[in-house]
Amino acid sequence: MYQPLPPLLTIKPSKVNGLGLFAKEKIKKGHNLGVSHIQIGKELFRTPMGGFINHSDDPNCTKSMFRVSNVDDVLIKSDYKVWRLFTLKDIKKNEELTLTYTFYKI
């Protein structure tokens, strides 16, 4: 069954801007929250998690990019990149998750 967000996250009104991404339970520092963005060729796609995480100059999350080499799929003829979100510190229940935006500086 498709789940747009990991079970430990939810979307709620944010004091930062509009809607934001919030922890439904405590999350430990270094936790891999999942995929926020995927780039195939020049096209960048964001997941619901990537779409709702708000910017902060003092973020509690960071992203890491992983290159995926395509060797088997004839429909996707290029390698692609996947960005995953990780927590930078322990996150409290109901705390908003934030990230320093850098994607649009690619």
Predicted regions and their residues:
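Conserved catalytic SET/PR domain of SAM-dependent protein methyltransferases, capturing the structural core
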Residues: 1-106
